[in-house]
């Protein structure tokens, strides 16, 4: 059987469905009328079109076909979807081209809003003027006399004009009540008005030949008969009434004019005006007028005030430091000149220029440092540096004398002998040896002044490299403090507090360099168990400069290790060593006042020290590791339990030779300080679980026994017996398989974890939407490119067509001219 072509099969199919062939057959006419309608015909055509165009249908074949299951989207019509997409893009492009270059907005057509040269008052005045113009053009006296409507029926009757929130009504506010007119004159005026109305009625209706009674009778008669008026009668009545009212108003105006002329002739109005002039209206002062009056008064006062003079601007820290350095250099030059005899005596003497007198900033700094020291003494009680006197009475008298001497020293100016030799400029030392050479020529009480002047002369903002030099100078001061603490002189400790304050100020800006220097000091002292007052000063500075509450600190942590090693490995066989150990324990307690980390060496040392001073044994755990040998020159005995809140001084740690009286006094003070330190340690460690075992030795100390029993009672009540951990019971492992009831083999994103399943679902949706968006963007870009190419081609075709048309027209004209030329030429040849 031969294979038929697709065109032939299409013709046969169309003919079979009665869509082609002869249509004017009589027998077929009845069949067509009773056959398919237009919708059926379109459906048949669409089926035939789909049948003969297999490329317009896309079917997604499945690997496994399951009967009875339809998958959505398995059959698609890419051609139709592409066509619909093209149409939608074409409509969107048309809308975009229509709106291209258009800018929407609201036009403000109010008076004066478009004029930027008018202020708000001018705008309101312009609006007011235009409103009055509209009123005058639409009503009032300019109305035609033949207008049928009344004056009160104009279109602008209900319109109200406002200005600054106040209504602008143009009614006359003339009130007769305040004119002083008596009742008789009022009655006379009422009679005049009544006569005027009566005269107007007579004149108006008489002129028109209309009787009011007759008009009323006609109206009543028509109302009684119930006959409807004709249009002509209604118009006549309206015209008559309008003319009547016009005539009435004209008569009233004439009557008023006559009365006015009569009053003018009798000089009545002049007398009335004089009476009105004599009446003084009471002025009402409102709150707004009072505010305006106060404003005007304040404005006049401001005008009369003197102009403020400009003050000097606030100077920066760098500028202040520069000025102070220049002052010091100038004073040093003057001092050198006076020393050489180059300056006259009447110019002033340098003996009166002491460091604390010549510069206010030094006094302010010292006062600030004293305040800072007082604040630090409140927080750091163990950092106080004072003497331990033989008895309390003597110490009180001595301290009173010292305070009196200090006040006298502050109130009186410095002596000539000390200030005359003190220079104003000093080189910044690079080592402790160089600093000793600089300060050796001056008294020790001038050391704070020397440090201040070095800081001012070498401020970090004055010269490059001064910051590093000051950091090195801070390290030199630390070495010098240790040097002063190790000296035997009593006066050395009086200036330590001032120098410590200077070091604390330098540590705020040079802490990294100082930390590295202190770590080197700690490493050098690590192998040595002997402690001097210099080491105690170093540990005190560490607690003042750095934070002791950090879990790990580059300086504090090594310092704590060195201090605990000293408490555990040193042999305390003398009063000075015991003082050094007690001072170290107090520093450690102060270190842990915030963090409260447990350091067992403190409690064990204090317990052993109290036992050695009282001559009793202790039952502390691991007590054998802390050796406290018998104290030389001291006979243990029952000490008087008298607590004190004073901290131990580091001065006695350097004293090697003590008298028996001093040993007795120091041992008593040592015992009191140890008991007080244990009390502070109990407050610090009262929350730890091992409190009863740690402070068991306090039962034998009367001052601490009650406190220990109270805290121990609560700690023992909080303890619970040791129990095993409670574990969750584990199920026995079984080999039975686990089935999922809602398992779906077609669901690729199945996951027993619901949260993870939701996450995967969101990711899949995001990926799908992203691919769809990218696909649409590509289609839009391709459509835009095709449209641009089509438009460019249309423009090019139009241009080429235009040029071809011009060329053709030119060629036509040239041909015509050429033919005319040839004809003329031929005719001339024939004439020859």
Curated annotation (Swiss-Prot):
Any keyword Chaperone? no
Gene Ontology biological process: maturation of SSU-rRNA; ribosomal small subunit biogenesis
Q: Where is the composition biased (Low complexity)?
A: 411-421
Q: Where is the composition biased (Basic and acidic residues)?
A: 9-18, 815-825
User: Where does this protein have compositionally biased stretches of type Acidic residues?
Assistant: 362-395
Record Pfam families: Nop14
What UniProt keywords are attached to this protein's entry? Nucleus, Ribosome biogenesis, rRNA processing
- Report residue spans for region: Disordered: 1-43, 301-334, 362-422, 807-832
Q: Which GO terms describe its molecular function?
A: snoRNA binding
Q: Which InterPro entries does the annotation name?
A: Nop14
Q: Does the keyword rRNA processing apply?
A: yes
**Which compartments is it annotated to reside in?**
Nucleus, Nucleolus
A GO cellular component term found in this entry reads: small-subunit processome
Q: What does this protein do?
A: Involved in nucleolar processing of pre-18S ribosomal RNA. Has a role in the nuclear export of 40S pre-ribosomal subunit to the cytoplasm.
Q: Which family is this sequence assigned to? A: Belongs to the NOP14 family.
Q: How does it assemble?
A: Component of the ribosomal small subunit (SSU) processome.
Protein name, UniProt field: Probable nucleolar complex protein 14
